Amino acid sequence: MQTKKTKTAIVVAHTHWDREWRYPIWKNRSLLVEFMDWLLEILENDPNYSGFLLDGQTVCIDDYLEIRPENKARIAAQVQAGKLAIGPWYTLPDLFPVAGECLVRNLNRGIRFAKELGGHNPIAYHTFGWGQTAQFPQMYQSLGIDYAVAAKKVSKERAPKCEFMWTSPDGSKLLTSRLGHFTRQNGYFYLHFPVRLNNIYDDNQYAWEWGKTGVAYHRADSKIARNDYFRIDHEDGYFKENVKDAAQRTWDNMDETLVDDYRLLMCGCDFSTPNPYLPKMLADSNEAIDDIEFKMGSLQEYFTELEKRIDRKEVPIVHGELRDGEPCYASANALATRIHIKQLNKHAENVMIRRSEPLAAALSTLGGGFPKSFFQRGWEYLLKAHPHDSINGVTQDKTVDDTLYRLNQAIEIGETLYEDSIATLLKRLDLSGFDPEDQLLLLHNPQPRPVSEVIKVAVDTPQEKNVWAIGVAEADGTPLEVQQISRDEHTQPVHDIEARPWPFSVDRHHVYLQTGTIPAGGYKVVKVTHEANYWREEQWWPSMRKSTADNIGESAHQLENEFLKVVVNPDGTFNLTDKSTGRVIKDMHAIEDEGDTGDYWAYYAPYNNQVISSRGFNSRIWLEDNGPLSASIGIETIMQIPAKAEYGEVKYQGYGKRSQDLVDMKIISKITLNKGDKHLKVHTSINNKAKDHRVRLMIPTDIKTEFSDAAGHFTVDRRGAVHEKDADGKFYPEMALRPMAEFCSV
């Protein structure tokens, strides 16, 4: 007679399907189609296969239906039957490289897409990426989601039990599970591997054996010999003798759960396909173990029952972001990998979120249409650039190219719609106060606050006017300050839908302009004036320029305005003085270079490291664009650094050093100070020819503080200035690398 079951294990079949990680998009798409075809067949034909979690996303359904559009009804049937859990995400982003608005749009798009098929997974499933943002509980609760599964990662010091109340800065709470050992893969590694493969994943015996493990092929072209092997037969093995120990071990690896007799076991892994033997494995587990009932279920089923078994008042509370490390789980190294992707993404976000969409929305309230379909396509390109592997570039070069392509499409769509909105605005303007031949400038302020600043603009005047210098005036004639930079000749096409492009010959004047106040989210119209003319054919007596003698550039190495003073040092660093307080910050903007034998995800210094400072090299320093509104100092430093690192077959095991061969790394910085600004603008570019290293910008503050602050997602993240140490007084230096958005401060 079988003993009555006193414990329950909810086993969730799932996969983690990276859209493009190990393989580029179309190789991955082929594998996805094979996977989805098989999954649908199992769900439709095996009544004991009660459900499958499709990784918390919906873009994989979108991708699949591009190839198999005829299967949309089949997918919808499984979603509506509760057997296929999809969403709430559209794509699976890494959080810290992308804007908070993008996370909200991602969730909204995923939920809408899922609802079209029958409904979305009501659990915040987020086991991907490298760290969780502090405001997730508020974001999820605003969407009606009260439970979460989160990994990568909260420490056991903060959450000694798997379950905790995750609390955001506004006080919103989610009942959350961090899962146990091997997190989302515990059932796959501890149950699937022994029973299906007669193997243990974390054992040294896990290796492919030619002629024994299965049949695999590999392309032998020498140029792609590094490509993976692919198995072409299906695994039919089943080792029932391993069931009891494997099932018990899987159960035991969730021993940190708050409810000892009710546990969540996740049976899936990266790119894992549905296991058709899973119902049999669970039936055999029930037969082999007397007191535990193993049954397939869903995250929703697990949390519904968990809620009944706990007292929320006794559940530990965890505040804020979840990125406690170890470094391989939450290192910021991925944030610094292929930085050009992040830069282009920031530009795309600015165009879509802060400029194009707000103006189009505002104009639509005045009776104009809103280009919804265009914006939907722009957001699709942007969100498809945000999967955690794609946005960080921890992929092959082909995928990097694809990600950049998507970002560029989003930018082009956003810029096009912005120009269309400006054209619509111009048609609506009352310009009766100006003469028909006046040249006008429309100054648009997309920010949610009034601005008055110095900007750099290019203003064209007809060549037949022979304008030597321009001015700019308010609508009432009040002049605005202008600083001339340069002038050149162009012939510019004028697009006309009713004619061929018209050639328009112009003088292009590059100037700095003090805008005067522009209202929040608004605009102003100003007039271009012709301050001086010249004889274009004159060769011997050029028109001379006058100066007000109040230039911001004091010398080739010094800038000063009302609030700040900058002095550049011979080594390329600079000293910054706040004139309102007298405080001086010295030796800013040194460059530090050191070896890195880690990988995409974690920084790892070679054992025999060399740290090289730009302060050991001379710099070339010059002044440019000097005038009363703006001035810039250029700094060029050429550092000699090791060409690469030398290490053994396994980078982390003992041997590693930087090479003796040196290469030049040219660093060019441009420091700009504008009239009236209380901040300094610095643009630095690096021509990198070396490998296996990292480059850091050093900004000493001499401020003693316990905390540092950084812009996060709809909050300011406060973190310890020094990373918290463990009981032995140690910490991982890599975890001192912190993410930031628009700013960081101490």
Residue ranges and their predicted role:
Residues 137-145, 165-169, 282-290, 311-312, ...:
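Short, surface-exposed basic-aromatic patches at helix termini and helix-loop junctions that form
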